[in-house]
Amino acid sequence: MIVTMTHPTPSRENGTCLASDMVLVHKVFRRELRMLPALVAAVEPQRVDRAALLGRHYRELATALRHHHHAERDLLWGRLAQRTQLDPGIEERMRQGHRQHDDLLGELDGMLDLWVADADPDVRDLLVDILTELAEHVAEHLTMIETRVLPEVDRHFTQREWLTLGLRAAGWIPLNRMAWMLGAMLEDATDAERRNLMGKVPAPARLLYRMVGQEQYVREMQELRAAA
């Protein structure tokens, strides 16, 4: 599968590229973080049920983003720096991006419980501002990764090394949320990306997702996005 980006990653002979799954994860972060400020802004005062629902969604995204960043920093940049003499300026920009994201996530973590407790509109408005800033900075960071880093993956990583990175990044996902993550990755996938991803899912898990998981994902996201 050839993943279309500003500067596409190099394809292997069978038409796939190692970084294709990371591109799908990036789509999840972009979409969900972009939508979250509007969803939070739409919560009326005292609607603690909606605040709690969106709070859980934010925490899941924040946990996923932190694990993704740790795997990216520990297993991606270092190896590329060793093997390709990764531009120190690019590496420093990526590190700055992570520090910026960590600061914003820390602010959100500190305020979220206050908002979930009583859905106070003043706290809500502050959250919206920070969530908007986070979404913008993360999207910019992911674009830089896709254009300046991922094109090097197929040339300098083995399948085993890339699998190790993927397992590290996905280490946060409990078994009962695997179907959610699969649904999230498939939501904006192209036909080629969908075939490539589903081809890596074990047959029993693929069948279970099609029988139960897909419907559960759609139902959950419809509830979450009800006010979008």
Tell where the protein language model's regions lie, with residue ranges.
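Small-residue-biased structural context
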Residues: M1-A228
